[in-house]
Design a protein with these regions (language model features):
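Predominant activation on well-ordered alpha-helical scaffold segments within soluble catalytic domains
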Residues: 17-20, 37, 53, 90-93, ...
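Alpha-helix capping at helix-to-loop junctions
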Residues: 122, 151, 155-162
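Rossmann-like NAD(P)(H) cofactor-binding subdomain of soluble oxidoreductases
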Residues: 53, 69-78, 82-138
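Short beta-strand and adjoining strand-loop segment in the mid-core
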Residues: 23, 27, 76, 134-154
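Conserved Rossmann-fold dehydrogenase catalytic segment
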Residues: 129-136, 158-172
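NAD(P)+-binding Rossmann beta1-loop-alpha1 motif at the extreme N-terminus of oxidoreductases
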Residues: 1-66, 70-75, 99, 128-129, ...
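Fold-independent oxyanion-binding glycine-rich loops
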Residues: 8, 31-32, 80, 105-107, ...
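Electropositive phosphate-/nucleotide-binding environments in soluble metabolic enzymes
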Residues: 9, 13, 30-33, 49, ...
Length: 172
């Protein structure tokens, strides 16, 4: 599995280390390429790119055929300040394929989650909110999407159980 990480500040860098420990490739992008390059040189991400378009390209290299071969869809994790999430999603959407998954890791707001997930589901993109705190993870999204990404979530809380909150209505 390979994921694209958008926002590799302190939280993103720490998450990527845990995720990579479970043999998942993590490719990083942030507006400050020198910071992303530094994380790559430390071995905290598998690779780094200079823009979201190339990040999507790299993530899709191994997952283009997932719908017919059972491979994992393109998975993108956002570790951004709340005010930057919608802008990043809009930029990423220009390069997403139907079936891709966007995970927001940050402060959870149900109204924002609902709005984003409804908008994205109309475009064939799945949306998951993942709130991490210390060694616990709370996940909100469709059961199928959470299952596809379970190895990511388990890597974030390896010594404890993680809770999933499956949304009802349009997402199931």
């Amino acid at each position: 599995m390979k994921i694209g990480l958008i926002g590799s500040g302190g939280m993103g860098e720490g998450m990527s280390c845990h995720i990579m420990d479970n043999n998942i490739e993590v490719w990083g992008y942030t507006n400050d390429y020198s910071k992303t390059q530094e994380h790559y040189e430390k071995g905290h991400i598998s690779g780094c790119v200079t823009n979201i378009e190339y990040l999507a390209y790299v993530v899709h290299l191994d997952s283009k055929e997932y719908s017919s071969t059972g491979k994992t869809p393109g998975v993108f994790v956002l570790t951004l300040p709340t005010e930057a999430v919608d802008e990043a999603i809009n930029e990423l959407l220009e390069h997403c394929m139907s079936g891709d998954i966007i995970i927001h890791n940050g402060d959870f707001n149900f109204k924002d989650f609902r709005r984003r997930s409804e908008t994205l589901s109309k475009l064939g993109i799945q949306f998951v909110d993942c709130d991490t705190s210390n060694d616990s993870v709370q996940i909100t999204g469709s059961k199928t999407t959470i299952s596809v990404c379970s190895s990511i979530f388990k890597s974030l809380a390896p010594n404890s159980k993680w809770n999933e909150f499956v949304t009802l209505g349009a997402l199931c």
